[in-house]
Amino acid sequence: MIKQLKYLLIISIPLFTSSCNGQINKETDKQSTEKLVTEKIEPYKYGAGDVVNRGYLDKSGNMWFTTLKEGVFKYDGKMFKNFTVKDGLCSNIVNAVVEDKNGIMWFGTAKGLCSYDGESFINIPLPQEDIQSVSSETGLPSRKTETVLSLIQASNGEFWVGTDASGAYRYDGKTFTSFLKFKGRLQPDDNVYNNCILSIIEDEKGNIWIGSFTHGGLSEIVGDNITHHALKDGYGDGMIATSYMDNKGNLWFGTRNGGIYQYDGNTFKNIADTNTGGQIAMASVLEDRKGTIWVASFARKGVYRYENKSFIPLDIKGSEKLNDIKFITEDKQGNIWFGGRYGLLWRYDGDKLKDFTQLKRIK
């Protein structure tokens, strides 16, 4: 992972936490990041749990990278600055990041929401008092959770928060309103609903689309009305991993095993070709400033360009290392960043790849 000090001259869909993959991530003690110390560098083999899972460009041109063990990193184009629980961050397990209309950074963590105004962090835990409520149809409860996996701020200023087990919440700055708590799979061991939300997006009309990774399908929220889309036509399995809106207003939805669906406002179309067979795990979608569609996969060759109705693997020096990619994002210079498991963080300038994966640093 990106394991290092407060400032560095060098240094990535999330690896699903808690109920999404049946594993519980626990906080681990971290060394203080307050002071620079003399150190040597040696190679370090990162494990699968060392994940750089989100990349985000803020309004000032800074890049933010969230991780599953090392908190958050801010990159100003020259140096990386690391924020952990030692600095007030609510948790070192961070799955989502967004900048609000006022320039405040918001993080989705294993301890709920966490806001940062440039000076201090504020924790906004998810509501726990409604967890005991049960479905009016089945009489069964939903899974309790504190973990945020996805986060956006809608055009009306409200936040939409996806959790790892309890569906989604709408947050207006004061009150959380629960959605889709009783969708998704029932855990066979205890008959409790488990709805893991990895993706939330707002379309051009202001409608909210919420994707479930635990077989809850795709939900479209228009005002107070909810429409469910199964996305099962022989390709998909109802596990929505990512969502994206391109410059034409088309929506893209990536699934765990069913490739990508494109929605033009009227029809869902499953996009498949002979290169992928339609059965590839999609983790992230991006349209760059040139109009090129990029797709990341958590399996096989990790990065593709979508050109002429075909997925073309990125094939340059170093690209064979781009496997199990969790996100793709673009910086203010037009460089494309990729990140994922085993601490991977790479930047592509249109010509070559540069590895920003951090080596282990020892005092």
For the regions a protein language model found, what residue spans apply to each?
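Carboxylate-rich, polar loop motifs that coordinate divalent cations or form catalytic acidic clusters
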Residues: 2-363
